[in-house]
């Protein structure tokens, strides 16, 4: 079977409903927390570490929910949403690889913010570089990522960690 290497908004919504990777497996959050409109490229080869990569995008418009509340009179996309999007994509990668279980963000190393997403922006691009995938009792991916707005890098994160668990009862 050939793996799909790009995903539309509808594909991602199917993933948020648990329909893409099957019941009980990795899901993306539903809107409004789904911070990705499309995955333009996913591969288990390539990237900075030659272990896999993802490129995804979010279309920006002034009507997005977070601009109304963060901050009044000074609208900016919360940086934590960009960080969460990177975790979402690492979890998606694990599901795409066929790892069973529900995804959970497990942490990260260094995160740096050196720019912002304003309502005047057009597009956010996420780049994820898989460093390592551990398979066993816990399936875990470790990745580095970056967020760019209209072609300019504004956030980086090292050591993004996401695991998939067949049971989250004792998590």
Swiss-Prot record:
Cellular component per GO, a single term: cytoplasm
Pfam families found in the cross-reference section: FabA (PF07977)
GO biological process, one term: unsaturated fatty acid biosynthetic process
Family: Belongs to the thioester dehydratase family. FabA subfamily.
Keyword GTP-binding assigned: no
Positions of disulphide bridges: none
Record EC number: 4.2.1.59, 5.3.3.14
Full protein name: 3-hydroxydecanoyl-[acyl-carrier-protein] dehydratase
Encoding gene (name): fabA
GO molecular function: (3R)-hydroxyacyl-[acyl-carrier-protein] dehydratase activity; trans-2-decenoyl-acyl-carrier-protein isomerase activity
Primary site of residence: cytoplasm
Catalytic activity of the protein: a (3R)-hydroxyacyl-[ACP] = a (2E)-enoyl-[ACP] + H2O; (3R)-hydroxydecanoyl-[ACP] = (2E)-decenoyl-[ACP] + H2O; (2E)-decenoyl-[ACP] = (3Z)-decenoyl-[ACP]
Function: Necessary for the introduction of cis unsaturation into fatty acids. Catalyzes the dehydration of (3R)-3-hydroxydecanoyl-ACP to E-(2)-decenoyl-ACP and then its isomerization to Z-(3)-decenoyl-ACP. Can catalyze the dehydratase reaction for beta-hydroxyacyl-ACPs with saturated chain lengths up to 16:0, being most active on intermediate chain length.
Pathway: Lipid metabolism; fatty acid biosynthesis
Domain of life: Bacteria
Keywords assigned by UniProt, alphabetized: Cytoplasm, Fatty acid biosynthesis, Fatty acid metabolism, Isomerase, Lipid biosynthesis, Lipid metabolism, Lyase
InterPro entries to which the protein is assigned, alphabetical: FabA, FabA_FabZ, HotDog_dom_sf
Record's subcellular location: Cytoplasm
Quaternary state and interactors: Homodimer.
Residues annotated as the enzyme's active site: 70
């Amino acid at each position: 079977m050939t793996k799909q290497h790009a995903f539309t908004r509808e594909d991602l919504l199917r993933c948020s409903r648990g329909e893409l990777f099957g019941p009980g497996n990795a899901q993306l959050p539903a809107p409004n927390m789904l911070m990705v409109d499309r995955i333009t490229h996913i591969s288990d080869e390539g990237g900075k570490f030659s272990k896999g990569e993802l490129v995804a995008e979010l279309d920006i418009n002034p009507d997005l929910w977070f601009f109304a509340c963060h901050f009044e009179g000074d609208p900016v996309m919360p940086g934590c949403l960009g960080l969460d999007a990177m975790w979402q994509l690492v979890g998606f990668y694990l599901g795409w690889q066929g790892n069973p279980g529900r995804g959970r963000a497990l942490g990260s190393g260094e995160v740096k913010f050196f720019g912002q997403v304003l309502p005047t922006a057009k597009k956010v691009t996420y780049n994820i570089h898989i460093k390592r995938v551990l398979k066993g009792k816990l399936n875990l991916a470790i990745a580095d990522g970056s967020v760019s707005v209209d072609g300019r890098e504004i956030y980086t994160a090292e050591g993004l960690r996401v695991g998939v668990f067949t049971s989250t009862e004792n998590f």
